[in-house]
Amino acid sequence: MPHEKLMIARLLLEELKVDRVEVASARVSEGEFDAVKMICDWAARRNLLPRVEVLGFVDGHTSVDWIHATGCRVINLLCKGSLKHCTYQLKKTPEEHIEDILSVVDYANEQDMVVNVYLEDWSNGMKDSPEYVFRLMDALEQTNIRRYMLPDTLGVLNPLQVIEFMRKMVKRYPHAHFDFHAHNDYDLAVSNVLAAVLSGCKGLHTTINGLGERAGNAPQVIEFMRKMVKRYPHAHF
């Protein structure tokens, strides 16, 4: 229900002081549209609108228009972070996918929207096709994308792999802002997000009590994470 979503968003942003909330996916339903609009109307009145985000897709103008119409001004664009996802799911070449992404980014910028990007399946991309990941990043780094969000989509990484892959990203793209998006398939989400922070990651995606997508994301342990910030001030949650 839209009012329930608004209540949760208010709790997260005002009481728990969460930095950002991704409140919906674009194009899901009229009910989701109404909920996002209600949240954005409330957030705008409290100068919190830049902290409200919506997941969007590489679909031309469709997701951007949907999100913009709700009043939201931040799109988290879902891109393919592995060659396997690009070729088998989209059935496109890397060049075609990059061209499609850049087109959406340009259009979102024309609407005065902030763009973050997910590199979906980034973990397997780094394991199996790192040259694809770097090729994609090389192209996207030329834009004004604000955050690059690196998901362990299937929850297959261990902390040592997170350290290795995150350090490679930070070393190659020192000016980029990287978020890490863990999944908890093998009960490693918390250890993996700590490894990401130690490796230079600047943002973490978490959920209340670990509830979330599929096997769950990393639990949001607010006070512990805030203490971590004192030691690693570059990180945001």
Where are these regions (language model features)?
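A structural motif
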Residues: K17-V18, C72, M113, I145, ...
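N-terminal capping/small domains of soluble enzymes
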Residues: M1-G60, I222-K227
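Short, electropositive alpha-helical surface patch
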Residues: F33-R45, M126-T143, M166-V170
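Active-site beta->alpha loop and helix N-cap motifs at the rims of alpha/beta catalytic domains
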Residues: R20, S25, R45-N116, D121-V133
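Catalytic cores of alpha/beta
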Residues: G60-I67, D128, Y132-L136, Y186-C201
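Glycine-rich, proline-tolerant flexible connector loops at the mouths of alpha/beta enzymes
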Residues: K17-A43, C79-K92, E120-G125, M149-L160, ...
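Catalytic alpha/beta core domains of metabolic enzymes, predominantly
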Residues: L154-L157, Q161-K227, F237
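Conserved, mostly hydrophobic/aromatic
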Residues: L12, I75, V117, Y148, ...
